């Protein structure tokens, strides 16, 4: 199976953990969209669930498929969240945020009893960091914040190019919360736990794309089917 087939296989396997009456968090990105589309087919066939999307993009897709939607203000407790990952390691530590929705994804995931990660085999790595780490920052004073990010990263053994994300027109990319994202190409992150905590102590940093101690399970698509990794 190619990578997209592996994503689909993982998404379909995740449906096994969805039960009638559940309140679900729905992730953002190409892998999560496979799950949302598969979930839409189940809803069309009569499955009774309600979903909380992690982005405007996911909300539009889910609505187009007839999936009933709610929000965390009205539904503050969720049963599971199913989302993709840009990278994951054997301890179920993740890098997320390639789709620009890391803050909402983390809020929704931590409002859930369980987070289930779905991914193709290429996303499973020994050491996080090959995928650039997204860090969400407020626009005010962002250049100062970026310098602080570089200093903190260096103190945790991470160096590399940092760049403010741009949209397809070359203009600054804004998240759904109207913040910037700096993508940090560290190559390797030797201490994900320490780096994540240190980054979030920087004034101006809203959050970062390291998900530590959040995922309960990963379903990884492979050439032969799917593998499950549990925390």
UniProtKB/Swiss-Prot annotation:
Pfam families in UniProt: Rib_5-P_isom_A
EC number: 5.3.1.6
GO biological process assignments: pentose-phosphate shunt, non-oxidative branch
Transmembrane stretches, start-end: none
Gene3D superfamilies: 3.30.70.260, 3.40.50.1360
Top-rank lineage group of the source organism: Bacteria
Catalytic activity: aldehydo-D-ribose 5-phosphate = D-ribulose 5-phosphate
CDD domains: RPI_A (cd01398)
Family membership: Belongs to the ribose 5-phosphate isomerase family.
Subunit structure: Homodimer.
NCBIfam families: PRK00702.1, rpiA
Entry protein name: Ribose-5-phosphate isomerase A
Organism annotation: Parvibaculum lavamentivorans (strain DS-1 / DSM 13023 / NCIMB 13966)
Lineage: Bacteria, Pseudomonadati, Pseudomonadota, Alphaproteobacteria, Hyphomicrobiales
């Amino acid at each position: 199976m190619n990578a997209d087939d592996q994503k689909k296989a993982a998404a379909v396997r995740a449906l096994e953990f969805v039960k009638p009456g559940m309140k679900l968090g729905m992730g953002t990105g190409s892998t999560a969209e496979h799950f949302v589309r598969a979930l839409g087919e189940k809803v069309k066939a009569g499955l009774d669930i309600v979903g909380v999307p992690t982005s405007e993009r996911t909300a539009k897709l889910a609505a187009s498929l007839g999936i009933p939607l709610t929000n965390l203000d009205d539904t503050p407790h969720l049963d599971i969240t199913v989302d993709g990952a840009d990278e994951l390691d054997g301890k179920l530590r993740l890098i997320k945020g390639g789709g620009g929705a890391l803050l909402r994804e983390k809020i929704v995931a931590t409002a859930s009893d369980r987070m289930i990660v779905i991914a193709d085999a290429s996303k499973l790595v020994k050491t996080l960091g090959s995928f650039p780490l997204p860090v969400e920052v407020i626009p005010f004073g962002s250049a100062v914040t970026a310098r602080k990010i570089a200093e903190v990263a260096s103190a945790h053994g991470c160096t590399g190019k940092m760049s403010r994300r741009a949209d397809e027109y070359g203009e600054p990319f804004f998240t759904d919360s109207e913040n910037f994202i700096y993508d940090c190409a560290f190559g390797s992150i030797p201490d994900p736990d320490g780096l994540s905590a240190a980054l979030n102590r920087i004034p101006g940093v809203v959050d970062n794309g390291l998900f530590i101690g959040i995922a309960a399970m990963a379903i990884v698509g492979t050439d032969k089917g799917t593998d499950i990794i549990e925390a």
